Amino acid sequence: MKVLVVVALLVTLISYSSSEGIDDLEADELLSLMANEQTRKECIPKHHECTSNKHGCCRGNFFKYKCQCTTVVTQDGEQTERCFCGTPPHHKAAELVVGFGKKIFG
């Protein structure tokens, strides 16, 4: 019973301190947070071309997408590099395992 009371008290204190922390944000901090959100929205989505900006891919569910490049040969015989944002195979495997674990354990 004492442990339950102590845990409830700790949860109350933590939630109170975190709510005060949110209230203490100043307008400048809010503007910088909004600017960060804007730059996050300007990232390159999955399956879109990232040839000119190889580090600008968005985040997926668990990992950031990687810019994956291939060499394309045109009909003229010229080789060009084309890149797209995608999920690497090892990240796909990790997401599959996590998704399977969530289904099993709830």
From Swiss-Prot:
Pfam families: Toxin_35. It is found in: Secreted. Its main location: secreted. One of its GO terms (molecular function) is toxin activity. Disulfide bonds join 43-58, 50-67, 57-85, 69-83. It comes from the Eukaryota. Expressed by the venom gland. The presence of a 'disulfide through disulfide knot' structurally defines this protein as a knottin. This is U1-lycotoxin-Ls1b. The lineage of its organism: Eukaryota, Metazoa, Ecdysozoa, Arthropoda, Chelicerata.
